[in-house]
Amino acid sequence: MDDLCARFLLNIPDSERLDMIRLMFQIELAHWFYIDFYRVEDKNLPEMRLPQFAARIFHAYPFLIHGDETSVSVLISNWKEYKKEVPTFGAIIMDKKMTHCILVQGNSERASWGFPKGKVNIDESPEKCAAREVLEEVGYDVSPLMDKKNFIEVDLAGQINRLYLCPGCPLKTEFVTQTRNEISNIKWFPIDALPLFAPPFVSAIAT
């Protein structure tokens, strides 16, 4: 735990360490690192969900908590509410004829299919976020295919979701996720036979 805190929490700028929302994002990164590397190398380490992991960190380093609120559960709840409003950006990767597009499937047992996308980082532009998330999830640099003005954007319960339309990807492209324990499947789907998981996006690209 000390090594994780030194890597992700203790040496970050004060602007992030003193802001509980930003600090929680760093704790989330530390939690992913714990799952992806520490527990893979040492099976005896306990499995911990984020709330339990955060509680252990705050117990070991109570000086990390700033402000009037000291309840870990409330801090996590506030952070989760904030995350719901963070915009997400990604891409609809299509072949040259625009008859097929790429979908990804999460790693959980009941994961559905979706377009590669993710939450924007602080001070990150929408198009850079989209390119970064796509590269992480499918291992493909979509930047050369991206037109900053060509996108579909929907507001889902107060959260902006934008997908850039990126035609021109060869169907023979080999996609390999750069993530760990996040993406289980990457597959081309015919646009006229997409799963009905996101009607606003599906209807927009099918017309």
Predicted segments, located by residue:
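N-terminal leader/linker segments that precede catalytic domains of diphosphate-processing enzymes
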Residues: 1-112, 119-132, 140-174, 183, ...
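Extended, charge-rich, solvent-exposed interface segments
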Residues: 178
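Long, compositionally biased charged/polar stretches
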Residues: 196-199
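Short, intrinsically disordered, charge-balanced linker/junction segments flanking boundaries
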Residues: 201-207
